[in-house]
């Protein structure tokens, strides 16, 4: 399950960073709670698509306005850190955080979320993620607007994705938004970049060439 995968990724990242035990435990708690708004999104809309609702904001509402956070931690000492990290974990860009510890935990959960998403994208059926077979995905092209964002080493804006390959490239573009060397170490050790790129059998010649460009740009 993704939630527990994020908890484990948070543990690994904070351990490699050499953080104090309190911050390690706090990062794992944030990992456990970061997608709590997803359950309501699924209940209401039967979808995880970002245009149905802001699951991060709803998670904050459930935890702090409705008081569910006290079921997980009695002390309110860390409420501001937890609230900020969860509220910001799915933002396109991480902005507007002035407190250094809040910023650190917001960066950790974003890294851990993306790191476990690598596992998810390798293990889940392509049909489940994209609605068609891997072979069908590999027949499609990458839109110029999406490639321009890759060239700029930016995450892909959801509204610019038009083809199935656009969606697949958007998963790879997560790597442009990694914050910590500890996370990069795990990505390299697991060979996630090549494994994800190689999962799709590309048959469109233009796509084959573009994906080699993507590979060379992302590799670090």
Identify the meaning behind each predicted range:
Residues 5-13, 53-68:
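An active-site-proximal "capping" alpha-helix that borders the catalytic cofactor pocket
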Residues 24-51, 59, 80-92:
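His-Asp-centered metal-binding catalytic motifs of divalent-metal-dependent phosphohydrolases/nucleases
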Residues 15-18, 41-45, 68, 155:
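Short, flexible helix-adjacent loops and helix caps
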Residues 65-71, 89-97:
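Short acidic (Asp/Glu) patches
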Residues 4, 8, 12-21, 33, ...:
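Divalent metal-dependent phosphate-bond-processing catalytic cores, especially two-metal-ion Mg2+/Mn2+ enzymes
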Residues 46-54, 70-74:
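Short coil/turn segments at secondary-structure boundaries
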Residues 18-29, 69-87, 101-108:
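Acidic/histidine metal-binding catalytic segments
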């Amino acid at each position: 399950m993704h939630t527990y995968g994020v908890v484990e990724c948070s543990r690994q990242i904070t351990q490699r960073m050499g953080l104090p035990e309190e911050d390690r435990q706090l990062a794992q708690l944030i990992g456990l709670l970061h997608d709590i708004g997803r359950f309501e999104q699924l209940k209401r809309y039967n979808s995880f698509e970002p245009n149905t609702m802001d699951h991060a904001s709803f998670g904050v509402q459930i935890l702090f306005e409705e008081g569910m956070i006290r079921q997980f931690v009695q002390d309110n000492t860390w409420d501001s850190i937890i609230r900020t990290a969860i509220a910001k974990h799915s933002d396109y860009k991480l902005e507007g955080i002035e407190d250094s510890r809040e910023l650190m935990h917001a960066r950790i959960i974003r890294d851990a979320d993306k790191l476990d998403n690598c596992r998810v994208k390798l293990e889940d059926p392509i049909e489940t993620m994209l609605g068609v077979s891997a072979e069908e995905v590999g027949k499609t092209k990458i839109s110029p607007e999406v490639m321009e964002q890759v060239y700029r080493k930016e995450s892909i804006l959801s509204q610019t994705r038009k083809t199935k390959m656009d969606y697949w490239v958007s998963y790879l573009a997560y790597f442009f938004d990694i914050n910590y060397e500890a996370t990069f170490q795990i990505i390299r050790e697991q060979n996630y970049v090549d494994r994800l790129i190689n999962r799709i059998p590309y048959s469109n010649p233009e796509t084959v060439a573009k994906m080699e460009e993507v590979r060379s740009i992302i590799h670090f």
